[in-house]
Amino acid sequence: MTKTLIIMSHPDVAQSSSQQFLLAAINGEEQIQIRHLEAILAEREDYHFDKTIERACLQEADRIILQFPFYWYQCPSVMKQWMDEVLTLNLLQKGKKKEFGIVVTVGAKKDRYTAGGSVGFGIEELLRPYQALANQLGWNYQTPFVIYQFQYLSESKKQQLLVDYLYYLENGSQQFNEKEQWMLERMGYYENTHTQQVREWIVELKQEREELVMMLSEMGNEADGF
């Protein structure tokens, strides 16, 4: 089973509704390890990371995820410290490449992060340095998973976010067919561990898939008539 390592940085996780939601989502996920950088540093007398421990965690993981709030278009300072102290070209991957993804929470609206928005750049462009980092270390860079204005999401949107987040942690890809298959494989697990809204969303996803297949089939039949 794929092992996912989440490197999380947030100065006040206890007061962050988005981070608490994401932590609850991975509760019980044995293949996912999370390291909260601020909590780790709080236990270090010299306020520096143990390079041996951190690098061992990286080496054992198949998929590495950096998770953080977007502060002035970059990660929190503690995550930057972790990168400065832990990452080295000696981690350059040989053989099967690790996958490397970004989970970032943004307080502003999505339309601000466009060429015509107030920021003037898209999120993916602003996160480009992390892609360069992945390239240097020989990791496969995944499309970032961006959460905009979590506090304004409806309950149904949050439940959809929960499933999308778990899928991203395990698979990275957002192909519809792949996600549907993954959902069906894990349906029994969700029935026992997550909310009724998630279970209902799974059923809706399956129904939408069936309707899409039927519609495409009908379109094909109509084309055959010409």
Predicted regions and their residues:
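Alpha-helical scaffold elements adjacent to nucleotide-binding pockets in ATP/GTP-utilizing enzyme cores
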Residues: 78-85, 129, 161-164
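A short acidic, helix-capping loop that chelates divalent metal ions and anchors anionic groups
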Residues: 41-43, 110-114, 149-153
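Short, glycine-/small-residue-rich phosphate/pyrophosphate-handling segment
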Residues: 98-142
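A conserved mid-domain beta-alpha-beta active-site/ligand-binding segment of alpha/beta enzyme cores
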Residues: 135-150, 162, 171-193
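Short loop/turn segments at strand-loop or loop-helix junctions that form parts
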Residues: 8-10, 37, 104-107, 146-147
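Short aromatic-enriched loop/helix-cap "lid" or pocket-rim segments at secondary-structure transitions
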Residues: 18-19, 113-115, 156
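N-terminal beta1-alpha1-beta2 submodule of the flavodoxin-like/Rossmannoid cofactor-binding fold
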Residues: 1-92, 177-226
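Short, electropositive alpha-helical surface patch
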Residues: 62, 120-124, 155-169
